[in-house]
Amino acid sequence: MAEIGRDGVLALLSDSANADSNIQVASESEVGDEITQTISDWDGRIIVAAVASNLSRIQQVFDAADATGRRVVLTGFDIENIVRTAIRLKKLSLANESLLIKPKDMSRFEDHELIILETGRMGEPINGLRKMSIGRHRYVEIKDGDLVYIVTTPSLSLIHI
């Protein structure tokens, strides 16, 4: 660390979640392949829970939607602003603009054409899923035939939900 400081690095920002764990995890490309395969294999509507700040995971969901001919509905708090900003900054890309649809337009599509991307409030999607499961979400209610696909590790603070 001292050597890095001498080289003129002012700050080091890193992600060390689960760094002390000995459990081997899949590579990001393997995760992306798994997301695409899971979405491809499901015939009904898919509700994906992701953290809003994980742009890599969101890109993987967009890529899987494009590969499987589905549309993505953004339902988390502020996720539309996050996605639009990330696209403008070239941190996210869409194969085509029609990939994203508004929640009010979901009824125009068959269930097998939809991925609902729930990122929740403050980037935590699990509470949004809970609301969907009890009919209190503003756009979506989980129904028979839906696949709820959690592509993040839920925070420990919400484990009781």
Annotated model-derived regions:
Residues 1-24, 148:
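Metallo-beta-lactamase
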Residues 4, 20-109:
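Binuclear metal-ion centers of metallo-dependent hydrolases, dominated by the metallo-beta-lactamase
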Residues 11, 45-47, 71, 113-115, ...:
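Residue-level preference for the first positions of well-ordered beta-strands
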Residues 15, 49, 151:
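A cross-family glycoside hydrolase active-site/sugar-binding cleft signature
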Residues 19-23, 124, 155-157:
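Short, small-residue-enriched loops and turns at beta-alpha junctions
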Residues 51-54, 122, 154-155:
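Short beta->alpha junction loops/turns
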Residues 75-145, 149-153:
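A contiguous, basic/glycine-rich beta-loop/short-helix subdomain that forms a polymer-engagement track
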Residues 159-161:
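Conserved small/polar residues in nucleotide/adenosyl-binding loops
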